[in-house]
């Protein structure tokens, strides 16, 4: 049996409205030597039936069903099943250009372990599209520049819009954290390590990946234990860098990461979804402000790396002015929600 050039790994969970668009974009790739592995994470809608429908009409599709275990377990299952020289992760509510595999593979050549393409953010609520400029910004920079930008929040740690050489993943035993370990930050955990171990990184300027954004969900959905997850990611990344004798090289960016993440978590408490009472929100904000890792990192970074609004918020957090931090966070979050609703 011929080894596929690319394994496209599709994570599926209750996306019956969008999955056909996704799977059609995979089926219509300009190159045939690919495999498409769909991992259904216990969906309760028609997504599994649609996936099986495609497997019957095209033998490049393979469907794996499992009980709901979370995104990390889904992607790990796909990695285990993959046979391709390269691996790409696709979310089932997104889609890719017909020449995605062809362009990414051509760019990879024989030496590149990681290829990153620009993506088009498709705003579901407004119908607007916004293209990223990752390739233009980082293609002439050493990979360390990208890693530092990842820690500083200048780029997102998405695992999609990338092509990974499977031998690199296997050689370094790369995998995603499981549910309960690093919730909400699985992609950044994996993306950082892939960049760290890649012999070289290449970029494609064309936006080959279409990322569907549901503003009402992303902007307003409360993420439980978000602060704890970020703190755990900070600590595990610091330990990883220490083991590889690189901690001092990235210390400043790591501190920036946890300070930025903490401020995001302050805003998270004031998202409109969820049933938290005012006392609970104030308590959670207080826990963030009092955290010793946050306070120590803030004392090192100061407020210089951040814009004026975030700097003001962090200055109040530094002195644990909890009522003012809460009020500023609530206003800041409402402004973000308003701007996102009226974007474009």
Curated annotation (Swiss-Prot):
The molecular function terms in GO held by this entry are: glycosyltransferase activity
Summarize induction of expression: Repressed by SinR.
InterPro entries, sorted: Glyco_trans_2-like (IPR001173), Nucleotide-diphossugar_trans (IPR029044)
According to its UniProt record, the EC number is 2.4.-.-
One of the protein's GO biological processes: polysaccharide biosynthetic process
Q: Which UniProt keywords apply?
A: Exopolysaccharide synthesis, Glycosyltransferase, Transferase
In its keyword annotation, does this UniProt entry include Transferase?
yes
Kindly indicate whether the keyword Glycosyltransferase belongs to this entry. yes
Q: Which family does it belong to?
A: Belongs to the glycosyltransferase 2 family.
Described function: May be involved in the production of the exopolysaccharide (EPS) component of the extracellular matrix during biofilm formation. EPS is responsible for the adhesion of chains of cells into bundles. Required for biofilm maintenance.
Name by which UniProt lists this protein: Putative glycosyltransferase EpsH
Annotated source species: Bacillus subtilis (strain 168)
Which gene does this sequence derive from? Answer: epsH
């Amino acid at each position: 049996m011929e080894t596929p050039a690319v394994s496209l790994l599709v994570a599926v969970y209750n996306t019956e409205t969008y999955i056909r668009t996704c799977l059609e974009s995979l089926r219509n790739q300009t190159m045939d030597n690919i495999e498409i592995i769909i991992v259904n994470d216990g969906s309760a809608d028609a997504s599994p039936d649609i996936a099986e429908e495609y497997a019957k009409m095209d033998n490049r599709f393979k469907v794996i069903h499992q009980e709901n275990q979370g995104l990390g377990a889904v992607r790990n299952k796909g990695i285990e099943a993959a046979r391709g020289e390269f691996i790409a992760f696709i979310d089932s509510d997104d889609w890719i250009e017909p020449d995605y595999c062809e362009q990414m593979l051509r760019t990879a050549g024989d030496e590149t372990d990681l290829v990153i393409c620009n993506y088009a953010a498709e705003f579901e609520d407004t119908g607007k599209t916004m293209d990223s400029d990752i390739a233009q910004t980082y293609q002439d920079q050493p990979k360390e520049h990208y890693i530092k930008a990842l820690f500083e929040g200048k780029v997102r740690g998405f695992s999609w819009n990338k092509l990974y050489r499977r031998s690199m993943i296997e050689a370094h035993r790369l995998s995603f954290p499981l549910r309960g370990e690093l919730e909400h930050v699985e992609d950044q955990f994996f993306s950082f390590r892939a960049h760290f171990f890649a012999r070289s990184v290449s970029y494609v300027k064309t936006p080959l990946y279409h990322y569907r954004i549901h503003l009402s969900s992303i902007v307003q959905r409360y993420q439980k234990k978000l602060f704890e997850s970020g703190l755990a990611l900070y600590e595990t990344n610091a330990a990883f860098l220490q083991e590889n004798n690189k901690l001092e090289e990235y210390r400043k960016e790591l501190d920036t990461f946890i300070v930025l993440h903490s401020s995001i978590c302050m805003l998270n408490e004031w998202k409109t979804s969820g049933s938290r009472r005012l006392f609970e929100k104030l308590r959670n904000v207080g826990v963030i402000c009092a955290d010793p890792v946050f306070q120590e990192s803030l004392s090192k970074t100061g407020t210089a790396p951040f814009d004026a609004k975030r700097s003001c918020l962090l200055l109040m957090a530094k002195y644990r002015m909890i009522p003012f931090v809460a009020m500023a966070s609530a206003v800041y979050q409402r402004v973000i929600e308003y701007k996102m609703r009226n974007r474009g």
